[in-house]
């Protein structure tokens, strides 16, 4: 537990993203898979999923995001939004997190007493 607390305390967000990384895509994928496997979950249901996007797929995610936000963010405020999206697009890749709702639903059915939680 102490090492986990130390890791959290030492964590810092890197706001300057870029494409220069020291790991290969395969190494990144392996490390992310290992982390996802070990992340605790309620009832150990392991419903968390991750999609890793690199290259053209990464670029497409941020282009779609930018064009979607352009439709809803007021024009006078869009420059700030665009700068933030462009900073994300400058990264080497994108990690998309989601929950597999089929796994969650199955767990709710197996444990109806706790389904609302």
Q: Locations of the language-model features?
A:
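N-terminal amphipathic, basic helical "cap/leader" segment at the start of enzyme domains
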Residues: 1-93
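Compositionally biased, intrinsically disordered low-complexity regions enriched in proline and serine
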Residues: 9, 93, 98-99, 115
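Serine/threonine-rich low-complexity intrinsically disordered regions
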Residues: 24, 74, 99-100, 111
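Small-aliphatic-rich amphipathic alpha-helix that forms the alpha element of a beta-alpha
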Residues: 36, 101, 105-117
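Beta-hairpin (beta-strand-turn-beta-strand) motif
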Residues: 55, 98-102
């Amino acid at each position: 537990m102490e090492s986990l607390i130390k890791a959290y305390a030492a964590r810092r967000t890197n706001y300057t993203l870029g494409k220069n990384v020291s790991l290969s895509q395969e190494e990144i994928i392996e490390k992310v898979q290992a982390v996802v496997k070990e992340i605790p979950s309620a009832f150990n249901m392991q419903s968390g999923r991750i999609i890793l996007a690199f290259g053209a797929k990464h670029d497409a995610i941020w282009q779609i995001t930018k064009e979607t936000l352009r439709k809803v963010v007021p024009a006078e405020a869009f420059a700030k939004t665009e700068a933030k999206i462009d900073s994300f697009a400058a990264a080497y890749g994108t990690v998309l997190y989601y929950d597999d709702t089929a796994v969650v639903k199955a767990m709710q059915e197996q444990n109806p007493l706790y389904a609302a939680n």
